[in-house]
């Protein structure tokens, strides 16, 4: 048996071309001083060059467009478009032509053909054209598989395939950080870096919160009733540049009232990023669900609801505390003790009975205190004792207050 049989020639030819938008023609201007040897030769040549901008010949960008010279890069979130053409190069009429285009990724195989219907016949020098589109959602190696089947005039069924391999790169590097506030607010800092080789126009960067939170963007400065982006009027992100976005998430009332709901790992939401590159090519990227570990408060949580920023020296002031039973099963019987520090003195009776506190419920408590030392003072010295388990919970450095003398505050 001859293993080196000649390769069979097919009657049809398959051509595949990636569809991308053209780019502006660039040239490298060469200039010199008038007193140099070339004189005005370079200047005259640039003015006569049809690709330069009239009146601005030294600009690298011209007025002409150039078609892509190679396959180029494909980035995650962009739309991959390709033109597929099957041409009859023979002098025979070909029948029952079927063209199928699949995209093989590392995890799945997708059919991209707009139509899989069989074409009854294809005359000589005629062609079948198709344009496919696919939003790229995976990085790594992709293989475009184009398969063509047809029948010759003699009734012989023919079939051939072609493979086109390309890599999908990551366009953005997204890093997130969470900051937990005492008021159950969560601040999300998103750092977005452009890791491509061309500038990006950041059309939209938004946070889609989960059902547990409401979100507010902190990337706009309000001046005289008008909002201005913290990044200025130009929203371009140059290659390797990083931009930081900040968001504030607040638990919805129905979840905030339930102390046991926002514990452990909670889903915050996901980032939705939309950008445009050269000549308006659009890309979109959505992160997976962002999760954060909620801070642990133990069985009993004490938080400050209201406290003045500035108080007078040796004059009483009030603060409002919120005490929450974070346990989902056990009722607590609490006793409040107030311990004085060198600067902070509590006003009232220590050892007060607060009564029973049911699971996942809260109570509000107003306390009076005064400071005997000026400056920024820390509020400390609260103790809660559960009489059922004989367990004491200590709360120090729960808030800070600025203490000024009475004369200084009166003058201001």
Swiss-Prot record:
Pfam family of the protein (one): TRAPPC13_C
TM annotation in the entry: none
Superkingdom classification of source: Eukaryota
Signal peptide: none
Family listed: Belongs to the TRAPPC13 family.
PANTHER family assigned to the protein according to its UniProt record, in alphabetical order: TRAFFICKING PROTEIN PARTICLE COMPLEX SUBUNIT 13
Oligomer status and interactors: Part of the multisubunit TRAPP (transport protein particle) complex.
Protein name (record): Trafficking protein particle complex subunit 13
């Amino acid at each position: 048996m001859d293993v080196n049989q000649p390769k069979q020639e097919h009657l049809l030819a398959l051509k595949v071309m990636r569809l991308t938008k053209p780019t502006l023609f660039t040239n490298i201007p060469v200039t010199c001083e008038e007193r140099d040897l070339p004189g005005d030769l370079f200047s005259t040549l640039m003015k006569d060059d049809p690709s330069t901008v009239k009146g601005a010949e030294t600009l690298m960008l011209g007025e002409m467009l150039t078609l892509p010279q190679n396959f180029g890069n494909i980035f995650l979130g962009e739309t991959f478009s390709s033109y597929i053409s099957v041409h009859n190069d023979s002098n025979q009429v070909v029948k029952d032509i079927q063209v199928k285009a699949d995209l093989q990724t590392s995890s799945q195989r997708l059919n991209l053909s707009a139509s899989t219907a069989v074409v009854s016949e294809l005359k000589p020098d005629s062609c079948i054209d198709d344009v496919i589109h696919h939003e790229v959602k995976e990085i790594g190696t992709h293989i475009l598989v184009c398969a063509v089947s047809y029948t010759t005039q003699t009734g012989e069924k023919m079939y051939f395939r072609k493979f086109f391999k390309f890599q999908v790169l990551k366009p953005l590097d997204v890093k997130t950080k969470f900051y937990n506030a005492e008021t159950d607010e969560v601040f999300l800092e998103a750092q977005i870096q452009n890791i491509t080789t061309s500038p990006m126009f950041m059309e939209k960067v938004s946070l889609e919160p989960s059902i547990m939170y409401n979100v507010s963007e902190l990337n706009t400065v309000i001046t005289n009733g008008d909002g201005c982006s913290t990044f200025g009027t130009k929203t371009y992100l140059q290659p390797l540049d990083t931009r930081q976005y900040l968001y504030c998430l607040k638990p919805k009332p129905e979840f905030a009232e339930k102390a046991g709901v926002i514990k452990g790992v909670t889903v915050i939401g996901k980032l939705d990023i939309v950008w445009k590159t050269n000549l308006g090519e659009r890309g979109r990227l959505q992160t997976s669900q962002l999760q954060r570990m909620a801070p642990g408060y133990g069985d009993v949580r004490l938080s400050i609801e209201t406290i003045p920023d500035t108080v007078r020296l040796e004059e009483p002031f009030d603060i409002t505390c919120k005490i929450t039973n974070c346990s989902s099963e056990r009722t607590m019987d609490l006793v409040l003790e107030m311990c004085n520090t060198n600067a902070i003195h509590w006003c009232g009776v220590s050892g007060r009975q607060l009564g029973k506190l049911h699971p996942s419920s809260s109570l509000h408590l107003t306390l009076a205190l005064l400071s005997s030392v000026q400056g920024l003072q820390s509020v400390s010295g609260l103790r809660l004792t559960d009489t059922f388990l004989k367990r004491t919970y200590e709360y120090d450095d729960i808030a800070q207050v600025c203490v000024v003398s009475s004369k200084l505050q009166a003058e201001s």
